[in-house]
Amino acid sequence: MLIKGTAGGPDPTIELSLKDNVDYWVLLDPVKQMLFLNSTGRVLDRDPPMNIHSIVVQVQCINKKVGTVIYHEVRIVVRDRNDNSPTFKHESYYATVNELTPVGTTIFTGFSGDNGATDIDDGPNGQIEYVIQYNPDDPTSNDTFEIPLMLTGNVVLRKRLNYEDKTRYFVIIQANDRAQNLNERRTTTTTLTVDILDGDDLGPMFLPCVLVPNTRDCRPLTYQAAIPELRTPEELNPIIVTPPIQAIDQDRNIQPPSDRPGILYSILVGTPEDYPRFFHMHPRTAELSLLEPVNRDFHQKFDLVIKAEQDNGHPLPAFASLHIEILDENNQSPYFTMSSYQGYILESAPVGATISDSLNLTSPLRIVALDKDIEDVS
């Protein structure tokens, strides 16, 4: 202070004292006209809960010569010090994202309002920025998500998701204040758990599925069936197929379950071309039925291609082969190719010697029997 007059010595001209000194934060040295902070046993804190932003006292000056009194107001402004770290309202945060969400979509806005991090410091020391940090326990998280606008903390999808590759991410998000000196900035972190929801991006697959090495593709699958010729549908239906025809949707965890598509089965193509006369496949159960008897004289086998597709307008079909063998009815008797046979052998031939078909004994005697059912030599 600089007040004209002296308050000390043998002949003082003024007398100085403090008025309205709340909580006695200020000490006065009247001789030196100096004010001191009285912080003995306590700390002057601008931040909550004390919230002392300024101290105002009145310096009373009495003119000892004429007896007049003058009051000087002194306002002491308490400047903020960056002595507090940000704190998150919650220990952790959670979000769910469908795997089909486009890149660039905002997937988390949970730091808006007072739901994110706060800092009780003032000015830049109390302003918050958010940034995603590398997580050694989930190394792909910081490449998959980003925070383009650090002041909002909104998390944006940076790369395409694939539920079949990864179903959960642990994203470490750091909050720091904006102190002008970067070395004085204080930080804290939280974890954002992001669960990936299964989307309808894969079609059905036939079972059993044997994977091609290092891929998600199934090896070609052939179902087998065999039916006797000339049998009626009533005798054979449903036709037994090995293994049973079954397909499942590769998107196995679409939520809610009511949104999961059903599977439709059908016969796509086949040989012989008249297969639709003989076989029908139930579109929902894949049950194979015979429509009319098959004569093996005209059809020995059928090779069909069957299809499984979704019923929701996103077909994404899968294909498999179905081989149907027509078995002989065994309605023909065997017969010999000759009515009689004559053979020759030496009288000295040992037991087990081969009988020949001529006197020179050069070739064995062949007895041939045929059966039209199997069209083979027996």
Segments from the language model and where they lie:
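Extracellular cadherin-type adhesion modules in metazoan precursor proteins
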Residues: M1-S378
